[in-house]
Curated annotation (Swiss-Prot):
GO cellular component, one term: proton-transporting ATP synthase complex
Free-text function comment from the UniProt entry: F(1)F(0) ATP synthase produces ATP from ADP in the presence of a proton or sodium gradient. F-type ATPases consist of two structural domains, F(1) containing the extramembraneous catalytic core and F(0) containing the membrane proton channel, linked together by a central stalk and a peripheral stalk. During catalysis, ATP synthesis in the catalytic domain of F(1) is coupled via a rotary mechanism of the central stalk subunits to proton translocation. Component of the F(0) channel, it forms part of the peripheral stalk, linking F(1) to F(0).
Family statement: Belongs to the ATPase B chain family.
Cellular location(s): Cell membrane
Keyword RNA-binding: no
Source organism of this protein record: Mycoplasmopsis agalactiae (strain NCTC 10123 / CIP 59.7 / PG2) (Mycoplasma agalactiae)
Protein name: ATP synthase subunit b
Subunit structure of this chain's protein: F-type ATPases have 2 components, F(1) - the catalytic core - and F(0) - the membrane proton channel. F(1) has five subunits: alpha(3), beta(3), gamma(1), delta(1), epsilon(1). F(0) has three main subunits: a(1), b(2) and c(10-14). The alpha and beta chains form an alternating ring which encloses part of the gamma chain. F(1) is attached to F(0) by a central stalk formed by the gamma and epsilon chains, while a peripheral stalk is formed by the delta and b chains.
Main location: membrane
Length: 189
């Protein structure tokens, strides 16, 4: 457009300078500037033929390559989504198993505490019963020993009384003789 404007300016200046010969020369130049109808038509037909040939030769392979590339990209996107879904599922499963493991561990700890407390209670109860039996046995033994000592003491006292009475009977009973017999008896024993 700019070229055409420059040419028309030059043409106007030349026309005004030389009106006769230059005018004809300019008309010839303008005519050669634009193609003729047969040339224009031949160029247009050649262009359409080139476009059609390129269309049939290049369009199908390019379209096929683009379709293959599009399928490859879509396949990768689908695989990525599938992998992402699988990894989310596995993560959820792992979290679920971890929560179950924590729950199991808490349950085991709780059961262990309960079992430990029951074992402690059982052994405490056994120890109390055993100590109670030992104390009862000791009381029984003490009572038995005390009773034995009382019986022995009674027996000894009875024997002593019999001995004293025998000795007193052999002698005349006076207060002094009785005291003397008791002293002698106690010295012997």
């Amino acid at each position: 457009m700019n070229l055409f404007y420059n040419l028309s300016l030059k043409a106007n200046t030349l026309l005004s300078a030389q009106s006769g010969g230059i005018k004809d020369e300019l008309k010839d130049k303008f005519k050669t500037l634009f193609p003729t109808w047969p040339m224009f038509l031949a160029t247009l037909i050649a262009f359409i033929l080139v476009v059609l040939i390129l269309w049939f030769l290049l369009h199908k392979p390019i379209k096929k390559a683009m379709k293959a590339r599009q399928d490859y990209i879509q396949k990768n996107i689908d695989e990525a989504k599938l992998t992402n879904d699988i990894s989310k599922q596995k993560l959820n499963e792992a979290n679920k198993r971890l929560a179950e493991a924590y729950s199991e561990a808490d349950e085991l700890i709780k059961n262990a505490k309960i079992h430990g407390e029951s074992v402690i209670d059982e052994y405490t109860h056994k120890a109390k019963n055993k100590s109670k039996r030992i104390i009862e046995k000791a009381h029984m033994e003490i009572e038995s020993e005390r009773q034995k000592m009382v019986d022995d003491s009674k027996s000894n006292i009875a024997k002593a009384a019999i001995e004293i009475s025998k000795k007193i009977m052999q002698k005349e009973v006076t207060k002094e003789s009785q005291d003397e017999v008791i002293k002698n008896f106690l010295k012997d024993k």
